[in-house]
Each structure stands twice: as structure tokens, then as C-alpha cells.
């Protein structure tokens, strides 16, 4: 439940337009709301508001077909609006036709059931590949989800171990990528060929000359499927353990990629919050041996 007072500059606005422009709701998000104006239920989003009107919104209960399951959830950060999870590798985020349960989503539904007593929809703001570890944002309601998508800022940083010695300390990869046919693998494609704009900022953290490996930080400026994996492979530095883009390597059982830091706009205060987590054990053990 949220309450607002209409600001003078929005006098005469339609209630739907007001909520979209000032609160970050999408058209889809508005359909999930019960809206009250000065205590009376609003049945049409074209209803005009007046300055100092009181607005109360309630989110309609939404069911999910994802059943709760006892899947371990490592909470990196939580408040009344968001849950940030430190995802382990080797777990799928959301059910698919081939994998209908034992996913992270099943664990999140179970976590919410235990902590709130309700079956809540797991609203993932971002997802990670099965073999990628690290931070995933889960919005607790459609308002927060819409806010992050439409109004808020979210910055995502990864650490990765790549093959080869990356020469430049810092650089920007600006190469459009896309898939060809039904291939999982992303390739460099021009926009005309169906490629999507993709930008990744790279910074070298440490070079391991004897092992011919480099630990890098990658900041996503866009969010494309396999973006870091594809971009580093295109640059000639595939991720260690990434069989799809770099071939098999006995030193790693999975791609050495970890979402270690996320910055996001707090929906209540507008201030930026930073959440940072440590590397997973397999990446730490690999680096400590060097």
C-alpha cells in the first residue's frame, strides 16, 4: 500500500498519467493496482486529479504457478522493496519447459512464503546464466519493478577470469551482437543484420603471466544475453571455463564469471545503494593457487 498527495503542478492530470510520470508505473503495472482518490475507488485511469488530492494504491494479489521449494537462498541485501540474492553457480534462475522446478525462482517463492506468509510472484529484475554466479535483484511488487525499469538507475559489475594477458588497463568494447538462427552462441552482427547494440567497460584487476590468465572487472552498459562472454571472446580473451565461446579447459568446471557488485536507486529516497559480495569459492581457490 502506498499513499501520495497530488503536487500542485499535476493539477488536472489523469490519474494514470500522473502515476506513470511521477511514480514509474507502466501501463501493465497500472492494471495490477487498486487506486483510491480521496477514499473512493477509481474505476477509470483517465480520472482527473486535483492538487492536494489524496491517492492510495494497493497492489492486487497476483498468483504464481511457481511452487515453493526448499532451495537455499543467500541473501546479500533486503529491505521492504527489494531482495538481492547471491546466486550459486549451477542453478537455473527461472523454470523452463525442460526444468520446471528446483530453480532459484522456486527458492524465492519459498523464502517469501516463510518470511511474509504469502505466495508472492518472484519479480526478477535481472537474470544470470546457470553457470554464472552472483547478484540477482528481485522486486517485491510491481511498483518497484516498474520504478527500476522506467525511472531508476541500476549499474551491474562483474569479475571474470579470462584466457590470455589483457594488455590495456581499461577499455570499452562497443560491438553489436546477436544470434544466428537457433544458435545459443552470440556473434558480432551489424544492426542491419539484426545485431543489438552492446557496450561493456573493461578494467584489468590483475594479470597472471605464468598461467596466461587475467582477472578483469566488466561493467555492463547494456544488457544483452551472453554479453560479457561474447564480447571477451570477440576480443580474443574468452572466459576461462566457457565451453561455448572458449572451448574446454580443465582448470575450471564453469565459466569464471561472477556478478559481484550492483548499484541501484533506492525507491524511497532516490539515493544510490551499493551492494558488493565476495568472489565464490571456486574462483577464489583458482586465483589463490596462482
For the regions a protein language model found, what residue spans apply to each?
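RNA pseudouridine synthases
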Residues: 1-172, 176-178, 282-286
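A short beta-turn/loop motif at secondary-structure boundaries
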Residues: 126-130, 194, 208-210
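Residues that recognize and position ribonucleotide moieties
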Residues: 126, 170-171, 195, 226, ...
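Long C-terminal interaction/binding lobes of large macromolecular proteins
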Residues: 202, 216
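Short coil-to-beta-strand transition motifs
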Residues: 67-70, 155, 190-200, 256-257
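Pseudouridine synthases involved in rRNA/tRNA modification
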Residues: 1-28, 206, 210-211, 221, ...
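Short Pro/Gly-enriched beta-strand edge/turn motifs at strand-loop
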Residues: 57, 182-186, 197-199, 242-248
Amino acid at each position: 500500500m502506498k499513499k501520495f498527495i497530488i503536487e500542485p503542478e499535476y493539477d488536472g492530470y489523469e490519474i494514470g498519467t500522473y502515476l506513470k510520470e511521477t511514480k514509474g508505473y507502466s501501463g501493465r503495472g497500472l492494471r495490477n493496482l487498486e487506486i483510491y482518490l480521496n477514499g473512493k475507488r477509481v474505476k477509470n485511469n483517465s480520472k482527473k486529479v486535483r492538487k492536494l488530492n489524496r491517492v492510495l494504491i494497493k497492489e492486487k494479489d497476483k498468483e504464481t504457478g511457481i511452487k515453493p521449494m526448499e532451495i537455499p537462498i543467500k541473501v546479500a541485501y533486503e529491505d521492504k522493496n527489494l531482495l538481492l540474492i547471491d546466486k550459486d553457480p549451477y542453478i537455473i534462475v527461472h523454470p523452463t519447459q525442460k526444468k520446471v522446478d528446483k530453480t532459484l525462482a522456486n527458492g524465492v517463492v519459498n523464502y517469501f512464503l516463510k518470511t511474509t506468509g504469502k505466495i508472492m510472484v518472484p519479480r526478477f529484475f535481472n537474470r544470470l546464466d546457470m553457470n554464472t554466479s552472483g547478484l540477482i535483484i528481485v522486486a517485491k511488487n510491481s511498483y518497484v519493478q516498474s520504478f527500476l525499469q522506467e525511472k531508476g538507475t541500476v549499474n551491474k559489475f562483474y569479475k571474470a577470469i579470462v584466457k590470455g594477458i589483457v594488455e590495456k588497463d581499461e577499455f570499452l568494447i562497443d560491438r553489436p551482437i546477436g544470434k544466428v538462427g537457433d544458435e545459443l552462441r552470440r556473434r558480432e552482427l551489424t544492426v542491419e543484420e539484426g545485431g543489438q547494440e552492446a557496450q561493456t567497460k573493461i578494467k584489468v584487476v590483475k594479470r597472471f603471466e605464468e598461467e596466461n590468465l587475467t582477472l578483469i572487472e566488466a561493467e555492463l552498459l547494456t544488457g544483452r544475453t551472453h554479453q560479457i562472454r561474447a564480447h571477451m571472446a570477440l576480443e580474443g580473451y574468452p572466459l576461462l571455463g566457457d565451453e561455448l565461446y572458449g572451448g574446454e579447459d580443465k582448470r575450471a568446471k564453469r565459466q569464471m564469471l561472477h556478478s559481484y557488485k550492483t548499484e541501484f536507486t533506492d525507491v524511497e529516497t532516490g539515493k544510490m545503494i551499493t551492494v558488493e559480495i565476495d568472489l565464490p569459492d571456486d574462483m577464489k581457490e583458482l586465483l589463490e593457487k596462482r
